Regions:
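Non-cytosolic head/periplasmic domains of membrane-anchored proteins
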Residues: 77-166
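Extended hydrophobic
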Residues: 162-180
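Ser/Thr/Pro/Gly-rich low-complexity linker/stalk segments immediately outside membranes or between
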Residues: 8-28
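Surface-exposed amphipathic alpha-helical segments
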Residues: 175-210
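Short acidic-hydrophobic surface loop/beta-edge motif
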Residues: 26-30, 145, 170-172
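Hydrophobic membrane-insertion alpha-helices, especially the h-region
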Residues: 1-9
Length: 210
């Protein structure tokens, strides 16, 4: 039931008109950077418009990276009934916003995280390294997970708490814009495919050149 509740909370419930799944991508500008966004991927109807916006919140089906059916509604099982498998954890969520005064991940690793992490790392899934944040710090209950052999893949993840699965945040900057992608920690067992799909997703949101 916990995963069903999370799916219900994550599902956008703002009222809005039906969306044509074949509608063309919207040119949206965030902090001077242009993105071409499928309307069905935009979670809030108020953000489904072209032009300049402060931020946009998106979701895509995984691993196809297709926009979800924005006209579908989540189902809540009857009391006492077993919950059906939820699609919430077959999605990747993306927030695009101005970077502003935020510190990029590469700098955070050098100047902020070392103050809060444990002294020693431990092996993670599929060759990754896990560095736990200490209790009593702002990141308590989270881990820093990265590829020690090559730079580029770094996520901050919550740990599983009972039936609630862990969630990872992956951050990418494009000029002055910050993209934060959220996905289940369990996906890290195939993190190389995750990283490749993230690259493909971000590239699909950018205007084509040439």
């Amino acid at each position: 039931m916990a995963t069903t509740y999370i799916a219900y909370v994550l599902w956008p419930r703002w009222p809005g008109p039906a969306i044509d799944p074949n509608a063309p991508a919207l040119p949206i500008v965030v902090a001077g950077v242009t993105f071409n966004v499928p309307p069905a991927a935009i979670r809030a109807p108020v953000q489904r418009r072209p032009g300049t916006q402060d931020r946009i919140d998106l979701s895509f089906l995984w691993p196809s990276l297709e926009p979800p059916d924005a006209n579908a509604k989540p189902s809540v099982p009857a009391q006492g009934a077993l919950a059906a498998p939820t699609p919430a954890f077959e999605r990747i969520f993306v927030t695009i916003s101005a970077g502003g005064s935020s510190v990029p991940p590469a700098e955070r690793v050098l100047t902020i995280y070392p103050r809060y992490t444990a002294a020693e790392a431990s092996p993670g899934p599929d060759g990754l390294t896990v560095l736990a944040f200490r209790d009593g710090t702002p990141y308590q209950g989270e881990d820093l997970i990265y590829d020690a052999e090559a730079p580029g893949f770094l996520v901050r993840c919550t740990r599983r708490a009972g039936p609630t699965p862990g969630t990872c945040l992956y951050e990418r900057w494009i000029e002055t814009v910050k993209l934060v992608l959220r996905f289940p920690r369990d996906w890290l067992t195939d993190w190389r495919a995750v990283a490749s799909n993230i690259d493909r997703l971000i590239a699909s949101l950018r205007p084509s050149r040439g």
